[in-house]
Amino acid sequence: MARSATSDARKKDTREKIELGGLIVKAGLRYEKRVLLLGALVDLSRRLNSDESERARLIAIGAEAFGDDGE
């Protein structure tokens, strides 16, 4: 039973990572260096924690981008 739960958790984690990678591709950042991507994400995290209007602005941009392909 524990082995099955561990396997399911690993599958879920893997699927989530694949989906997150897809967001990088969708944003047009597939060929950027990983250190740049990580730096951008760390900076974003800091800005989101201190500025609710930035969160709202980025949600609107993301919703528009997903709307382009029906997601």
Curated annotation (Swiss-Prot):
Pfam families in UniProt: TraD (PF06412)
Entry keywords, A to Z: Conjugation, Plasmid
InterPro entries referenced in this protein's UniProt entry, alphabetically: Conjugal_tfr_TraD_a-type
Domain of life: Bacteria
Family statement drawn from the similarity comment of this UniProt entry: Belongs to the TraD family.
Name listed for the protein in its UniProt record: Probable conjugal transfer protein TraD
Species for this entry: Sinorhizobium fredii (strain NBRC 101917 / NGR234)
The encoding gene: traD
